[in-house]
Amino acid sequence: MKNEACRICLFGHRNFDGYRVVDTQLFKLIKELIDENGFIEFYIGRNGEFDVYSASIIKKIQKEIGENNTELICVLPYYNKDIEFYANYYDDILIPEVAEKSHPKNAITKRNNWMVEMCDIVVCYVERNEGGAYCAMQYAHRLGKKVINLVDDN
């Protein structure tokens, strides 16, 4: 078990229809990562269906094993009207300065890159060779991050 937190970011395409395919797989993977790494900070956006789905899986695991070894952090590209709702759901909310100061059309890309830079492991669901999730996954590969694409296991 490590003494410092392992940081894991999760992202995928905006539209996600792989619920049945990855439900058990994602649940099992997250539990294994917790067992292997001790305390984990999960960095996750809120801009796509995979983000929301992944957060719900992590919340389910937190209810099952407790919250002492995990922190679910919502990383927003900029302030939005739902931030109070998010504050009641997530353990913490972050808005990276690099994203907040960029043009709104570029803020999600900046946020995704920031999450990749901050994390040790990337867990993603990327099935197309285009879009923001694909670009973030490629960025993670370029930085030498450990990347687990759930599509590859199906």
Where are these regions (language model features)?
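Acidic/glycine-enriched connector segments
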Residues: 2-154
